Amino acid sequence: MGRYCGLVNDTSPSRYVVVVTHATRDDAFDAAAEFISEMAGRDIGCAVPDDQAKPMSSKLPGIDLESLGEFAHEAEVVVVFGGDGTILRAAEWSLPRHVPMIGVNLGHVGFLAELERSDMADLVNKVCSRDYTVEDRLVLKTTVTEHSGQHRWSSFAVNELSLEKAARRRMLDVLASVDELPVQRWSCDGILVSTPTGSTAYAFSAGGPVMWPDLDAMLMVPLSAHALFARPLVMSPAARVDLDIQPDGSESAVLWCDGRRSCTVRPGERITVVRHPDRLRIARLAAQPFTSRLVKKFELPVSGWRQGRDRHHLEETS
């Protein structure tokens, strides 16, 4: 994400917060500018990515912009204004530095986000007082290996990695193995390997189960597999998953990590997925259980269909 710049007052602050916004949404910059202004008034410095420094400074007259540089590693928390995609982008910076993230949802579902735009006062107060807890979540590490055994690409996934066919005309022929033992050879459109955090994202749309984020597990979901056994598999977090694109008849595939980083994978190559040594750190400002978040985000009908039908009947007869 490049060099970070600090928004500071006349004296150097003793505390720092990183702020990341959706790259193109003006309302995200407005919300971030309001937050940064509040932080500056409390002698807390804020940092923004290079590509966001200029548009942010235009919304913050009277607050000088200067290089943060060596202070970036002192950041207490990353505050993200946007949807889950923006949070996944911010994770590329926060994960290797072990800095927790707080998401402010300006998108649609926003499962990774902790707050809404209307919660700004609560956000400011709790960041200032460090009144939050931190969850450590499983992250995946993936490596692409050539037939010769040479590693040629690696990345990480907070939500999921998806192996997908590159061309519509043919299915992928993939052998899936767990802990170096073959499990299933699928002719399919692709295969997902997901974290519990990602189980409410692509894997959910593909028919996978919802997993509570404090569960340590790996989830494998075949995509449109032409097979009698094409069920999602939940595995140990210590498992090793190998996906071998068969050299006979398959074409190249594309491996995506969180829909952001990609690599072309050729027939005869292997994708290996293991637990990443780093954990994603998510800051929580409220003790809201995941069950409540699930019901709220997906608008699950917990009142029951009969209650809704009876209410509709009363409205018609009144």
Swiss-Prot record:
Record: residues binding NAD(+)? 84-85, 89, 159-160, 170, 189, 200-205
List the signal peptide residues: none
GO CC, alphabetical: cytoplasm
Chemical reaction(s) catalysed: NAD(+) + ATP = ADP + NADP(+) + H(+)
List its EC numbers: 2.7.1.23
Cofactor(s) annotated in UniProt: a divalent metal cation
Q: Where does the source fall among the domains of life?
A: Bacteria
Q: Which InterPro entries match?
A: ATP-NAD_kinase_N (IPR017438), ATP-NAD_kinase_PpnK-typ_C (IPR017437), NAD/diacylglycerol_kinase_sf (IPR016064), NADK (IPR002504)
Which residues does the entry assign to the active site, renumbered to this chain? 84 (proton acceptor)
Q: Which PANTHER family match?
A: NAD KINASE
Q: State the function annotated in the UniProt record.
A: Involved in the regulation of the intracellular balance of NAD and NADP, and is a key enzyme in the biosynthesis of NADP. Catalyzes specifically the phosphorylation on 2'-hydroxyl of the adenosine moiety of NAD to yield NADP.
Homology family: Belongs to the NAD kinase family.
Q: What is this protein called?
A: NAD kinase
Q: Which organism is it from?
A: Cutibacterium acnes (strain DSM 16379 / KPA171202) (Propionibacterium acnes)
The gene coding this protein = nadK
